[in-house]
């Protein structure tokens, strides 16, 4: 049985991937804030900035595939804490890529639409010109370049990611003080009967974490190489996404307050077009879930909480 090691196994994507892959692979991983405590999966607390410990762990473990879900993805935090952002999003990724090459492990690294400036009129394809407009996007681009120096490696970009972890503490935040994921934050606000301001002028291609985990496992099993986008075919504004999700879950849609990104007063520039084109991934045989299918799955998971 081949081995998969997941950096960030306690994350939304990492834990979903671990559960999905454990019947076909020997899965283990490291976590920072929380141990997912998944049955039959070993996980270890690890400071990934201690690269010698990382190297020792991987050399002893000898995984066939290494998946890196670790990132500081709070755009405002990255702008104000550039040293920390670069250390996690770029420097660690560069070191990890070199370690993977030395032990002959394939690296699958997760990236973001933020490597683009968000001004294109249509969805971004993999070979579109990158032009990050904030420090987070710059660090993610640096990480991508390090990984892709090795042709066998894979980088998978994603736009808006959402999902549900039933054992999660409702107000759990990441190490950069960002809510665990946008979808869960939004749902819990409405469940508490709190109003939320949602922007109307940002378009994206949201993907549920369960489907994103399927994409990652697909890239392992198909031995994909290079750069791919993971994005369902639905392009939607964040406001319309929230309206549809609230309707599906039977939550009060009147609590959703429409605002423009300018009215929201963001501290850091972000692009308004976050849509990714995933035809390249689709041509490998992967079929993305529809938005309706994703919402139905999410509702099932919430009902089980």
For the regions a protein language model found, what residue spans apply to each?
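Conserved C-terminal active-site "lid" loop/helix of NAD(P)H-dependent oxidoreductases
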Residues: 237-243, 260-298, 302-304
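NAD(P)-cofactor binding segment of oxidoreductase domains
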Residues: 80-108, 141
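Mid/C-terminal beta-alpha module of Rossmann-like enzyme folds, strongest
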Residues: 199, 215-216, 222-267, 272-273
